[in-house]
Each structure stands twice: as C-alpha cells, then as structure tokens.
C-alpha cells in the first residue's frame, strides 16, 4: 500500500469515527472541527518568597491543594507569618529541586504599600528599558516564575505548575545563579553528547533541575537592613550527576513539556495589564 493510499484510508477512518461519535451523542459533526479549538489561560496556584531567617519558598495550603501536591499530611505543613502579620499554613521549602517552565522578563512596578494610593502595584515597564526610572523607595523590580518541584528521585511533587513572584534581592540572586547553572548544563550536555556547545531555548532548559539551598541574608544600609531570600548554593552538573539534573528520558520530559505547552502563557495573568503605566 502506498503512502498516499494510507493517508486516504486514515482520513476515511477518522471521518467514520467522527460520524459514529456524533450519532451516538446526537450532535452535529461540524461541531467537532478544530476551528473551535482555542487555548485558555488557566489561573495558576501561587507561592510566596519568604524573606526571613530561615528563608525559602512558601506555598499556602490552599494553593498546594490547587497544585495537586501529593504529600499533604499535617506533619508536612509549616505555619509561616506573612509580611502583613497574617499566619498561614503550607509547604515551606528552604531547599528545592525545581524546573522552570518559563518566566517574565524583569519589570519595574510600584510597591504595594498603602501610602502609594492608586499607584500601588502599577507597572512602570520592563527593567531593561526603564531601569533609569527606578526609585527604590517607592518601586521594586519583579519577575514571575512558573515552577514544578521534584523529589530526589525526580518525581513531580505536584500536578499543576506554581507561579511565584521574585522581587529585588531574591530576584537578582536567582537570576545570577540560574545564568551560571544553565550555562554549565549546556556545556556539560555538549561534552556528553559530543556536540558543539550552544545556548538552549526555554523548552530545553525546562528539563534542567535546579537544585538549590536558600538562606536568609541581611541586606540594606544602616537601620534599614532586613532579611532577604538568597540562593546560598546550588548543584553544578558533572558527568556523574548529570542524569539526576536533566530529564532527558522521554517518559520524564513528556510530562514537563505538556505542562510547558499548557501553562507558560498563563504567566501574563500575574501582570495587572489594566493598571500598566508605560513610561518612555
């Protein structure tokens, strides 16, 4: 049988299948067309950066449940006092094994303090284009990250990605560490695969597991010093540990790329577009 005939037969079989399904459920076959397909942006569960001692990433219990966190026994929950004084129980991670599905380019926004009135949370613009406008007293630099957390056996700890906003010191610390980590992963991959070293796109980098320890470090000047969440150390790849830091097997990366394709566009939900203030 030629490829042309095979293609014709497949089309006929698909048409028969659609007609059978349409007849069974009594709806018009035309409603099964792909022209009705449209990506929908899900509202993702979120986590919080804890700038304290100890420092780390905190996923409130309600959001951990939304994310499908597998281990939710009372003993796995920690009570944290949030910046506003409110106490909340959830998953508190001072060390992580995580993959980054995507991120938003760093941007400047006004802080969320009540004194700023209507300007609270208003976005000024991208940091790269507007860094000269940054007023550290009233503004902050932020970025959103879409994360999946894994255990030491590279099994996912939850089913849905979690969105976390990193700001200021916590953001710069993460960015610096990730730059070194991804470069090392790309170099090590090239050496093992005996190919030319090259930077990789976000889809490939989403298979790299960032294994890191957080630490609360006091930053600032004089009496304004406060604890900030910084990456204290992270694992660099070697020929011996590369397999533990890279989800290269098909059964592993298929789940990650499915999450990537379904959720990366949802990062834009974290940006309050209706209040954007773009300055030139």
Question: For each predicted feature, which ranges?
Answer:
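OB-fold ssDNA-binding interfaces and closely related basic DNA-contact patches used
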Residues: 2-161, 222-225, 238, 279-280
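Polar/charged alpha-helical tracts
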Residues: 23, 30, 176, 180-191, ...
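Amphipathic alpha-helical interaction segments
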Residues: 77-78, 180, 265
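Extended serine/threonine-enriched, polar tracts that run as long, contiguous segments within proteins
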Residues: 143-237
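Accessory, usually C-terminal, subdomains that scaffold auxiliary metal cofactors
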Residues: 200-204, 213-278
